[in-house]
Amino acid sequence: MSRYLFSSESVTEGHPDKICDQISDTILDALLTQDPRSRVAAEVVVNTGMVVVTGEITTTANVNFTKLVRDKIREIGYTEADNGFSADSCAVFLALDEQSPEIAQGVSCALEVRTSEEDALDRIGAGDQGLMFGFACTETPELMPLPISVAHRLTRRLAQVRKDGTLAYLKPDGKAQVTVEYERKDGVDRPGRIDTILISTQHAAVIDDLSDNDAVQARIKADLQTHVIGPVFADLDIRPDAQTRLLVNPSGRFVIGGPQGDSGLTGRKIIVDTYGGYARHGGGAFSGKDPTKVDRSAAYAARYVAKNIVAAELADRCEVQVAYAIGVARPVSIFVETFGTGRVSDEALMLLVREHFDLRPAAILRDFDLCRLPAQRGGRFYQDVAAYGHLGRPDLDLPWEHTDKAATLKQAIQTAAAV
């Protein structure tokens, strides 16, 4: 038996890059709520005292972009001007254009339509070329890798204890990283123990009557053990042990944070958004993009495929790649890999995927109702996945997390085996 370490990180909603992702998806939610046909590519930059919203938007919706920006910043928790960034005092600059008519043509009128080789679902072409990956494994109940699952739990808990006043001295910016020791036996990898927990969290310079930084850091570490780490691991089978390293603010001090400490940009946390580096990534970001962009919708669909394969007990680990050409509806390739954990061959699974999953953009939009979900969910949907992961979210009802095809896949394999 061999052992190895694997690490994944997460960031809080107050991290500068995540502020941008959430603003981008708040704009997307508002536009799709009014006009489900909106074409959106909203990019955001934040820095000390400043927000820039740019990109390409084509819509009939009428929204107050500046108000959307300020409301989201306030919800995240940046309300004090002395942080160098606050909802009411930051400047908001808008620089928005319409979607390129050449790109719009390829999306609205796919190659299959232009060559008269189509059915109704061929009408929408992919918004760009690219490759997307989906993944699932049996390490957690939500079928996600353990390191990223625990890292997200930690950052969500950091935000919770800040907002509910349990640890009122915490500020919005923060990060967590979890290192898991895996055991490999007979070619099978299983998480064995938690090797390292790293938390960096922004905090007030003075906590109660403590002003000495060493005392402040000791208080933070003790509080995080009690109010964050303990509750996060309470319902997990794998927990920190006597040898687990706990690192809290190892840089020594974290008072200056958020956009005052670092600029932020939409789309810079794509590994945090997905599988924490445990699976491959095609490179395309999600936030700020309407669902006709396959960077987003096809990555969700690939996760759906992989999760249903694992839920059907056809594999313990499954990765699905799908690739597209701009303006073409049908994927140019589909690939399935189970890393030696499959109950049937990867080739058989690829045939199963082609038979039971329609991965054309219009079919993905239809099956998940991606353009109408914001209106159906009271005006907010995408902004809720813009922090703490787009995948493996038991706290949210996400259509790509459903395992409604697992029974069908299992039956199809059993039927084929009986022939």
Swiss-Prot record:
Annotated pathway: Amino-acid biosynthesis; S-adenosyl-L-methionine biosynthesis; S-adenosyl-L-methionine from L-methionine: step 1/1
GO cellular component: cytosol
Lineage of producing organism: Bacteria, Bacillati, Cyanobacteriota, Cyanophyceae, Gloeobacterales
Protein location: Cytoplasm
Name used for this protein in its record: S-adenosylmethionine synthase
Co-factor remark: Binds 2 divalent ions per subunit. Binds 1 potassium ion per subunit.
Gene source species: Gloeobacter violaceus (strain ATCC 29082 / PCC 7421)
Residues where Mg(2+) binds: 17
HAMAP family recorded: S_AdoMet_synth1 (MF_00086)
Disulfide-bond pairs as recorded: none
Gene that this polypeptide is encoded by: metK
Region (Flexible loop): 99-109
Cofactor: Mg(2+); K(+)
Family membership noted in the UniProt record: Belongs to the AdoMet synthase family.
SUPFAM superfamilies: S-adenosylmethionine synthetase (SSF55973)
Enzyme category, top tier: transferase
